[in-house]
Regions:
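N-terminal leader/linker segments that precede catalytic domains of diphosphate-processing enzymes
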Residues: 1-123, 127-294
Length: 294
């Protein structure tokens, strides 16, 4: 049976990726083991500034110097670190066991995924989904610029930062959305859980901290992204079709799923069934394409 191509789009499979797929199919190469990762689709009602805008999502453009997805526009996120599973990190919201049931994994893994999602989003956008109590939220992300850069510089762990500031993760703000696994043919693979979350009132997503604080910290950003922008999902998809931005398939599919929502509340009210989605590089003697899961 022939694997279907991605409907409505042309996905070019690089020659090296096609070669790896052929090697794996022939049994001469084993797929890389995917590393756990987490990402947050930050949402806000763009209509506040742009009448008729509806829901907008925050996208970062990865630098072209990176090995994985150079130049692609992605949601804030990254790999799970060992410290993300620390049970001492303050937690507010559904217990890890409840989130684990929705994610289809263990409580320990669910805790690490939520923590990684919040940590990476703070590192990459400056938005911190945490507060001093189960109902409070940080309302001035700019005030945490030096803490953000200390985290990026590795001079403080996320758990230490939250503990010193008296903050706890607001796990209740994260809505599980999807799970995507990098194709087996890729040399670097990730098992990534997607969450949706609202931009907290008073916080601003930014690629860098205020200049004077960034200079004091000796850093200018995460180093992985060179631009950040709020876009309506349909607007982002149209920009990708026009060749103005590059979207990885999981990002494009997620934006397509969000495009039918007109307010943030309707997105966050979703209770989605989370099942792994694994795109596949399909090859024959002369061609290669990406087959998408249903």
């Amino acid at each position: 049976m022939t694997e279907p191509r991605l409907a409505g789009a042309s996905i070019t499979v690089p020659g090296k990726l096609a070669d790896r797929a052929r090697e794996i199919a022939a049994g001469r190469l084993s797929p890389a083991v995917p590393r756990d990762a987490a990402t947050i689709v930050l949402l806000w009602p763009g209509v506040l500034l742009r009448p008729g805008a509806g829901v907008e999502a925050y996208l970062l453009r990865r630098t072209r110097a990176l090995d994985f997805a150079p130049g692609a526009c992605v949601f804030p996120g990254g790999s799970v670190d060992e410290g993300d599973a620390d049970p001492a990190i303050g937690w507010a919201g559904p217990p890890p066991a409840e989130i684990a049931d929705r994610l289809g994994t263990s409580p320990e893994r669910a805790r690490a995924l939520v923590c990684a999602a919040v940590r990476e989003t703070f590192e990459e956008s400056g938005v911190l989904l945490a507060g001093s109590s189960p109902t409070a939220l940080v309302d001035d992300s700019a005030a945490l610029a030096q803490d953000r850069h200390a985290l990026l510089a590795g001079t403080a762990s996320f758990g230490e930062l939250l503990g010193r500031l008296g903050l706890m993760l607001r796990a209740d703000l994260l809505t599980p959305w999807a799970r995507w696994i990098t194709p087996e043919a890729a040399p670097r693979r990730f098992d990534t859980w997607f969450f949706a979350a609202p931009l907290p009132p008073g916080q601003t997503a930014s690629l860098t901290a205020p200049a004077e604080q960034a200079e004091q910290a000796g850093q200018t950003g995460s180093g992985e992204s060179d631009a950040g922008i709020w876009l309506r999902p349909a607007e982002a998809l149209e920009s990708a079709r026009a060749g103005q931005i590059t979207l990885l398939p999981p990002t494009a599919v997620t934006l397509g799923e969000l495009a039918g929502h007109h307010d943030v509340a309707s997105v966050l009210a979703q209770r989605r069934v989370i099942t792994p989605r694994l795109p596949k590089v399909v090859v024959n003697d002369h061609d290669a394409w990406l087959a998408m899961p249903p």
